[in-house]
Amino acid sequence: MVATPYWPEVHHPNHQATHGRNGNVRYLSDRDRLKHRATFTGNTLVIPPQRRFELGIMQNTAGNIIYVVDSQRNFYVGRKNLGHFHHSSFMAGGPVLGAGTIVLGAGYQILEVNNHSGHYRPGARELKRVALAISTLGGDLNQIPFRVSGAGPDVVYGNGLALLDAAV
């Protein structure tokens, strides 16, 4: 688990950040979070049809979406809206197993999963946890490329199994 969010004061009982609870960045309730839950089939992201328009993730639209994986390995996705909806929105700034961006092609095909998150700043270990969650939720790691970003140059793995085999 990413033990400490980038803004550790979120755990303070008097947390008064200018985002989230008192600012413009939305924090999801448990009920609202369920609308963002996703699964996988092969190398395809599965979002319930009734939620696609609401989440702004349409089948014919390629692009980037953000994700987090909670401690129960549930996978949540959404469109980043700078200043309004961030990685921290999903779990109200609380800890997660992993976070980043999914690059989607048409038909919800996954072109890449990475660990780009300014709030949580996950590393390769967290991205491995994400890969395991994707596999548990129906994804085929043989078909999904992963990119690890960090202090050095990005490392691209042609598939999730290569990421899991890597020493990090």
Over which residues does each language-model region extend?
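Eukaryotic phosphoinositide-binding membrane-targeting regions
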Residues: 1-168
